[in-house]
């Protein structure tokens, strides 16, 4: 399995590690596999990884479907792997007020994602071919616009609005792993 992208990809890999999804898999990471990177993948030293992978996960933060679609076509020419683009997660503008949420209320506290993130996410979900997009906003939240701010124990899921804490990775690990397997069928 190969995970590609920026810090979002490293966050995804950590999420999969927390849930033991990677326990019996060969795993590699490449930052050269960004959703909108225009590098010719076949010319990279990592090309053998792309060819030998059975699953490629590429994280998307803000890019649109045009460059992502081009990346999908480039990869399809290079590999037989299942290719899944993993959409963004976003915990709003400002995490600071969440520190004042009472422990008893944390498990039901939701935060609004930034509108431009949800708009891009919706566009990607509509434009990418079926089975190639993992919509984190809809998977982890109730409506594609909001995400839980805390786990059931009141622990914060993000410290910086865009990446998971360890608690966030544990919270998301099973749903993300299950969705990857569902998309691969």
Would you name each region that the model predicts?
Residues 1-185:
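Extracellular glycan-modifying ectodomains
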């Amino acid at each position: 399995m190969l995970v590609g992208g920026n810090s979002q990809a490293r966050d995804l890999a950590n999420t999969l590690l927390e849930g033991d999804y990677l326990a019996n898999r060969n795993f590699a990471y490449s930052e050269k596999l960004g959703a909108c990177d225009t590098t010719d993948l076949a010319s990279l030293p990592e090309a053998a990884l792309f060819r030998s992978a059975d699953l490629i996960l590429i994280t998307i933060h803000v890019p649109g479907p045009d460059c992502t679609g081009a990346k999908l076509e480039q990869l399809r020419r290079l590999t037989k792997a299942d290719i899944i683009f993993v959409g963004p997660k976003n915990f709003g503008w400002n995490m600071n007020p969440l520190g004042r949420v009472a422990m008893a209320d944390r498990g039901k506290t939701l935060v609004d994602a930034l509108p431009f993130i949800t708009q891009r996410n919706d566009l990607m979900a509509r434009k990418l071919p079926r089975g190639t997009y993992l919509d984190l906003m809809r998977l982890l939240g109730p409506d594609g616009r909001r995400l839980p701010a805390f786990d059931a124990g009141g622990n914060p899921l993000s410290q910086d609005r865009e990446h998971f804490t360890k608690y966030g990775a544990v919270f998301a690990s099973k749903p993300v792993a299950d969705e990857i397997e569902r998309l691969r069928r």
